[in-house]
């Protein structure tokens, strides 16, 4: 089963929006990435988010393009400073699922899942980007299968 990790889109500064919802550019980046993912027939059963405004907005934009049967849901344990190892040990992914979250949590979760250590950066995420983790034959840990990022360079 694939696990799609998504960093929320670019947010407004706290001075403009205390809840830090998506900026216009951030929402546009997420829409563009969502359209590409839909074109490539990315299918997920559910899209999870942290409950933070920018995460929920990102999840809703992705949901409009990907139409997950179980919709968009909030989940605890994926906020920026939450324990990625604890989350990974308790999470059960039995279908293709997407998690919309925050840094540094997402990069720590990815590192733990792929190499078994959350303190070793293995991929630099971008706001609005998607990383697909999937199992590779004869391995016990997932690998990075592909990534879609709003910006190159």
Question: Can you annotate each of these PLM segments?
Answer:
Residues 2-82, 106-107, 117-118, 124-128, ...:
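Active-site-proximal alpha-helix that buttresses catalytic centers in soluble enzyme cores
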Residues 85-141:
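Active-site-adjacent alpha-helix immediately C-terminal to a catalytic or transition-state-stabilizing loop
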């Amino acid at each position: 089963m694939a696990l799609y990790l998504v960093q929320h889109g670019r947010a407004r500064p706290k001075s403009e929006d205390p809840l830090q919802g998506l900026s216009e550019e951030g929402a546009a980046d997420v829409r563009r990435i969502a359209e590409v993912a839909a074109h490539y027939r990315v299918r997920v059963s559910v899209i999870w988010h942290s409950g933070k405004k920018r995460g929920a907005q990102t999840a809703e934009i992705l949901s409009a393009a990907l139409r997950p049967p179980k919709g968009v849901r909030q989940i605890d344990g994926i906020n920026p400073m939450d324990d990625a190892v604890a989350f990974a040990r308790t999470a059960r992914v039995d279908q293709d699922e997407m998690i919309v979250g925050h840094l540094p949590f997402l990069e720590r979760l990815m590192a733990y899942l792929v190499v078994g250590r959350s303190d070793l950066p293995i991929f630099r995420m971008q706001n609005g980007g998607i990383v697909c983790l999937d199992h590779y034959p004869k391995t016990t840990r997932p690998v990075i299968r592909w990534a879609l990022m709003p910006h190159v360079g």
